[in-house]
Amino acid sequence: MAVDLESLLQRYVMFLLHQKGLSGETYRAYHNDMNHLMSFLRERGGEEISKETVRSYMLKLHTTYSRATINRKLSAIKGFFDFIIRQGALEANPFSHVRSLKNPGSLPRFLTPDEVFDLIDATKNSRDRAILELLYSTGIRVGEVEAMNCYDVDMTAGFVLVTGKGKKQRRVPVGRRAQAAIRMYLRERGIDDPIYSRDPLFLNSRGKRITTRSIRWIVSKWSTQAALSRQVSPHVIRHSFATHMLDSGADLRSIQEMLGHASLSTTQRYTHLTVDKLMDVYDKAHPRAKEE
């Protein structure tokens, strides 16, 4: 298979970014996945991909990564070789016979409401508090926070405009506490009404748009400061938002819309958490639930 994979990879990542409209976070993940494969091929002395090469690479993945990460990498690789076929440089996808791994059905980790409150109360500056309040108030993704501009926040209507995967936009309600935290932070920057500002919503210490890496670091830093018993990430806060909403009676369709899930089945993971809670309450409270 004498094809210039490196050159085709550059064309593929540009295709993902400009034509497929992948979010920055997903684009970077796919790009890193393909670079991982390229590095593996270079270590083997070239870019020729045989069945043995595919088997060796998949074995390497199985000994290093989780099922979810392996499936994501496999999806990126299959998409890349399908792209090469469409370009006329290959006749068959060398990874087409490799099946995705079944998800064991692990439930998302989440914080209790008290843990979330402790996390937010531990913050010592207005920007970080506004970020944490926004994450928990809306359940949006870390990459969506990074991409937000000031004019995406409508204080009057109580909504934020979120640009999600595939450049799809949705309006998500934002609570009063999050609004107040954002307003305080923006006023420190001299912005009274965000709807009239085209600046990034959150800035780093150099006055540039904050990155997803920085947001993750902020969440981790304050979770340590709050002495929480588990490591916290923006995604854990997102799971906490969904779980708390469902526990409080919100319907699945509304949660799906707020989270930006394309499929309701993705949102339905949270129903398992609520069922577990209901069973626990039932076992403790119902007179006929206890064993004699």
Where are these regions (language model features)?
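Conserved catalytic core of the tyrosine transesterase superfamily
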Residues: 1-292
